[in-house]
UniProtKB/Swiss-Prot annotation:
Protein's recorded name: Uracil-DNA glycosylase
Lineage: Bacteria, Pseudomonadati, Spirochaetota, Spirochaetia, Spirochaetales
DNA damage listed as a keyword: yes
InterPro entries listed in its UniProt record: UDG_fam1 (IPR002043), Ura-DNA_Glyclase_AS (IPR018085), Uracil-DNA_glycosylase-like (IPR005122), Uracil-DNA_glycosylase-like_sf (IPR036895)
Organism: Borrelia recurrentis (strain A1)
Gene3D superfamilies: Uracil-DNA glycosylase-like domain
């Protein structure tokens, strides 16, 4: 079936788009947007924003989230990211705090992480849509099957990618990744409830930049 997505991703995922579960997923999502109007996030054109912003071969880092923000106007299709006119959520505030601590730089007070994506950071939510005010409302419609395949495809076809797995949900994806050719960094989730259990002080961003340098890759400006 035809899916509007960046061309290199379309090639990598074409067999996935033809599977029964994905066709059922698309049918469900279309009906959700039709019947619930503006209460499904992100807007339809941004569902695959993480893919459209970053061609497959340019991935250097994967940061895995769970599902989109469920408040109006927040989600923009990139994990942990919000639109630039939206107040920075607590988890992202802690991410910026850890960057400033470990890299000794001042982050830009803007929650739109498109600037990271354009440099090679794949900001992937495991579940790509959500209903307003109902976190994890779309967790069982097929998105996890799809994004698990995405992770496996990245692991198989690319080399020396950094995977940042924050929290138990993300850590559960470790089994999908070839640890012999990629760097996996694990710690607690940056949420205020768990950031002090390892995330703050993890040095994930400095470790990432060092790994990219060691493998002769252009580093990422995480400001």
């Amino acid at each position: 079936m035809e899916v509007k997505i960046e061309e290199s991703w379309k090639e990598m995922l074409k067999s996935e788009f033809c599977k029964g579960y994905f066709k059922r997923l698309v049918s469900f999502i279309k009906n959700e947007y039709k019947t619930k109007k503006d209460k499904i996030f992100p807007p339809p054109r941004l569902i695959f924003n993480a893919f459209d912003t970053l061609p497959f071969k340019d991935i250097k880092v994967v940061i895995l989230g769970q599902d989109p923000y469920h408040g109006k106007g927040q989600a923009n299709g990139l994990a942990f990211s919000v639109n630039s006119d939206i107040k920075i959520p607590p988890s992202l505030q802690n991410i910026f705090k850890e960057i400033e601590r470990s890299l000794k730089i001042k982050t830009i007070p803007n929650g739109d992480l498109t600037r990271w994506a354009e440099q090679g950071t794949f900001l992937l939510n495991s579940i790509l849509t959500v209903e307003e005010g109902r976190p994890s409302s779309h967790k069982d419609i097929g998105w996890k099957i799809f994004t698990n395949e995405v992770i496996k495809i990245i692991s198989k076809n690319l080399n020396n990618v950094v995977f940042m797995l924050w929290g138990n949900f993300a850590k559960g994806k470790k089994k999908l990744i070839d640890t012999s050719k990629h760097l996996i960094l694990e710690t607690s989730h940056p949420s205020p409830y768990s950031a002090h259990n390892g995330f703050l002080g993890s040095n994930h961003f400095s470790k990432t930049l060092r790994y990219l340098q060691e493998h002769n890759k252009t580093t990422i400006n995480f400001q």
